[in-house]
Regions:
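Solvent-exposed beta-strand/loop surfaces of large extracellular or lumenal domains
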Residues: 466-489
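Conserved, well-structured interaction surfaces
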Residues: 21-219, 224-354, 443, 531-576, ...
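Short beta-strands within extracellular/lumenal beta-sheet-rich domains
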Residues: 431-445, 484-488
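Bacterial N-terminal signal peptides that target proteins for export
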Residues: 1-7
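An acidic-aromatic loop/edge-strand motif
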Residues: 40-53, 337-391, 477, 490-545
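Aromatic-lined ligand-binding clefts that engage carbohydrates, nucleic acids, or primary amines
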Residues: 404, 442-468, 503
Length: 586
C-alpha cells in the first residue's frame, strides 16, 4: 500500500461535537468472527513499526497514547457479548477500542469509523451485527434465496447410502435433517435486519446528540464474512463456490429491500485469510460486484493484501518453540529417557541424590465415597477424593511414611502407548489403586539458580507439594509420554530451601473405555537453570524462533483464521472499507 497522507490525528475524531446540520450517516457492518474482530489492543504498537501504517496508529490513539474515543462516531454492536456465537447482547457508546469480540479487542469498526468520519466530516453511527461461526448458506441465508438444498454432486452420493455413512444420515433421518436446516436458515439475517430497524427507530437511545430535524441517511453496508462457507465442503463440493455468489447477490437485494434502501452502497469484504490462497472462494465472494445490476453501488475490497507474511511465517515457529520450552525431557520409543535431546543440558537437577537414584515412598488408594466415584468414563479423571483416615497430612514433612512401599521412579503400571512411544517398564509398580500418593526427600546445598521448574511425567492431572506446600496443580491430561516443564514463580520457589526438602505428588491413573486396563506413570523432579545457562539456551533457541520472528509475533494475539488477531491487519481493513464506501457515494 502507498503511504496515506493524513492530517494530524486530532482532526480525525475531533474533541468537540460536529454540528448535526447534515443528516447523520448510518453505516451497517455485518458478518461473522472477523467482523467481530479479535485484534487485541496489546498489538497496537506493532502497527507503528511499519512506516506505511504508522499514520493509522496515530489516528487510533489520543495525545496520551490511549485508544482514541471518537466524539462524533457512535456505535451499536450486537453479537460480541456473552456467547459470541448466538447471544443478542448489545453494546453502545462512542466509538473506541473495545467494540471487537471483547472489551480489549477491535475489529474493522474502529478505523472504519475514524476514516469515514474524517472524510465525510459529518457525525457517523455504526450499527454492527456479527456472530462467530455463522455461514451465509444457512445462518445469514437471505429470504429470496429459497430453501437450502444439497448440491447435486452431494445428493448423488447420499442416494448411494440409504443406510447412512460417514457424514451421510440414514434415509429415514433426512426429513428431520432438512427440517433442522430450514429452522436455522436466515435466523441471523433476520436478527440483523431487526436490529437495524430497532436502532434507527430510536437513534437517540444510541446517539443522544442526534438531530431529529436533520434526520439520518443509511449511507452504506459492509459485509465481512466467509470462513464457515469456505470450509463447508458439503455445500460447496469440489471447490466450487458459485452458490456463494448467488446467495450473496440475493443477500444484497434482500437487505436493500428490507431496509427500503434500493441503492444502498454495499462493500463486500473479500476474505483474505491465508493471503492470496483460496482463489476460488475469493473470486466467488467478489463476483456480485461485477453484476450489471450492481454496477456503481457494490464494490469488492480484497483483504488479502493486508495479510501479514512475517506473522504467518513466525506462528508455526512459535508452536515449535513452545513445544520445546514446555517439554523438560522426552522419551525414546522404548520408553526410556532420551539423554541426547539437545535442549536438555541447560536445566540441571536440584538436590541429591540425583532423580534417577532417589528413593520414593508411595501408597495407592481408591475413591470410596459416592461423591468421589466417576459413574461413567471421562477423559479428565483427575479430582480430589476423601483419603483414608490418618492420611490427611500425607504431604507434610512430618508425616510418617515408613510403612509405605519404597522404590525408584517412574512409578507405573499397564501400558502407556502414544506417538510411537511405548512406556510399559517401570522401576516401581504403581499397584491396584486409582490414586497414588508419593513422597521423596532430597538435600540442597545451595540455591544459586536464576529460575526453577518442575519436570514431571504424568498421564493424568496432579498436585505437587514442596515441604508441605502445594506448588502446582494440573487438572487435565497428557497424551504423549514426556516430561512437562512447569516454571515456578517466586511464591512457589520460596518453599525450596537449603538442607532437607520433601517433594510429594498426588496423581491418578488412566484407562481407555475400549481397553479398560488401567495404566499410569509418574515421575517428578525439581530442576534449576543459572542466568548464564539461560542466556545460552535463549541464544540456541534463536535457531527455532529468531528475534525477527519474536518481533512479528508482537503483532499477533490470535490464530490465522482471525487474521492473527493483529490490529495492524484490522486497522488497514477498516480503513479500506471506509474509503470504498466513500468512493461509492461519490
Amino acid at each position: 500500500m502507498k503511504p496515506t497522507v493524513i492530517l494530524t490525528a486530532a482532526l480525525l475524531c475531533v474533541l468537540s461535537p460536529i454540528s448535526f446540520a447534515k443528516p447523520l450517516k448510518v453505516f451497517i457492518l455485518a458478518g461473522q468472527s472477523n467482523m467481530q474482530g479479535h485484534a487485541n489492543t496489546s498489538t497496537f504498537d506493532y502497527i507503528g513499526k511499519d512506516p506505511l501504517t504508522g499514520p493509522i496508529l496515530a489516528a487510533m490513539r489520543d495525545a496520551e497514547g490511549k485508544p482514541r474515543v471518537c466524539e462524533n462516531v457512535w456505535i451499536s454492536s450486537l453479537g460480541c457479548g456473552g456467547n459470541q456465537y448466538s447471544d443478542m447482547l448489545e453494546k453502545t457508546g462512542k466509538l473506541t477500542a473495545g467494540f471487537g469480540a471483547s472489551d480489549s479487542e477491535i475489529g474493522p469498526e474502529f478505523t472504519f469509523g475514524i476514516y469515514s468520519e474524517k472524510t465525510l466530516k459529518v457525525p457517523v453511527l455504526i450499527i454492527k451485527t456479527s456472530w462467530g461461526g455463522r455461514s451465509l448458506n444457512i445462518d445469514f441465508r437471505p429470504p429470496s434465496a429459497g430453501q437450502y438444498q444439497l448440491p447435486k454432486a452431494v445428493q448423488d452420493v447420499w442416494d448411494k447410502y440409504p443406510l447412512g455413512s460417514h457424514g451421510v444420515p440414514k434415509l429415514e433421518d433426512r426429513k428431520k435433517w432438512q427440517e433442522d436446516k430450514d429452522a436455522a436458515s436466515g435466523v441471523f439475517y433476520r436478527a440483523l435486519i431487526e436490529h437495524v430497524r430497532k436502532v434507527t427507530k430510536d437513534i437517540k437511545r444510541v446517539c443522544p446528540e442526534y438531530d431529529e430535524k436533520a434526520g439520518y441517511e443509511l449511507a452504506g453496508f459492509v459485509w465481512f464474512q466467509g470462513f464457515n462457507d469456505l470450509v463447508d465442503g458439503q455445500t460447496y463440493p469440489n471447490g466450487n463456490y458459485d452458490e456463494y455468489s448467488r446467495l450473496l447477490a440475493h443477500f444484497i437485494r434482500d437487505v436493500r429491500k428490507d431496509l427500503s434502501a434500493p441503492k444502498l452502497p454495499f462493500v463486500i469484504g473479500v476474505l483474505g485469510v491465508d493471503g492470496d490462497k483460496n482463489v476460488n472462494f475469493r473470486k466467488a465472494m467478489a463476483a456480485p460486484a461485477d453484476m450489471p445490476e450492481f454496477k456503481g453501488n457494490v464494490v469488492a475490497v480484497d483483504t488479502a493484501p493486508f495479510w501479514d507474511h512475517d506473522i504467518a511465517a513466525a506462528q508455526p515457529k512459535q508452536v515449535e518453540y513452545d513445544a520445546i520450552v514446555s517439554t523438560a525431557h522426552t522419551l525414546k520409543i522404548d520408553g526410556t529417557l532420551d539423554k541426547e535431546r539437545k535442549w536438555d543440558g541447560y536445566w540441571k537437577p536440584v538436590g541429591t541424590p540425583l532423580p534417577e537414584e532417589r528413593i520414593w515412598r508411595f501408597a495407592t488408594v481408591d475413591a470410596t465415597e459416592k461423591k468421589d466415584i466417576l459413574e461413567k468414563y471421562d477423559g479428565r479423571r483427575f479430582r480430589d477424593i476423601t483419603l483414608p483416615a490418618g492420611m490427611e497430612n500425607w504431604h507434610t514433612p512430618e508425616f510418617d511414611d515408613s510403612k509405605w512401599t519404597e522404590g525408584k521412579a517412574p512409578i507405573g503400571k499397564g501400558v502407556w502407548k502414544h506417538s510411537g512411544i511405548t512406556l510399559d517398564k517401570f522401576p516401581s509398580t504403581w499397584g491396584t489403586g486409582e490414586f497414588l500418593l508419593m513422597r521423596s526427600t532430597f538435600e540442597v546445598e545451595d540455591l544459586n539458580c536464576d529460575s526453577y521448574r518442575i519436570a514431571i511425567l504424568a498421564r493424568q492431572g496432579f498436585h505437587v507439594y514442596l515441604n508441605g506446600q502445594k506448588i502446582h496443580t494440573y487438572i487435565w491430561w497428557q497424551d504423549k509420554p514426556q516430561y512437562g516443564s512447569i516454571v515456578l514463580g517466586k511464591e512457589q520457589i520460596k518453599h525450596l530451601k537449603k538442607g532437607k526438602n520433601v517433594l510429594a505428588v498426588y496423581a491418578n491413573d488412566q484407562y481407555d473405555p475400549n481397553s479398560p486396563e488401567h495404566y499410569a506413570a509418574i515421575d517428578v523432579r525439581i530442576e534449576g537453570i543459572t542466568k548464564a545457562d539461560q542466556e545460552k539456551l535463549d541464544l540456541a533457541l534463536e535457531e527455532v524462533l529468531s528475534p525477527k520472528d519474536r518481533e512479528a509475533l508482537k503483532g499477533a494475539s490470535n490464530a490465522g483464521y482471525h487474521y492473527f488477531g493483529s490490529a495492524k491487519i484490522f486497522a488497514q481493513i477498516g480503513k479500506a472499507f471506509a474509503e470504498a464506501i466513500v468512493n461509492l457515494k461519490k
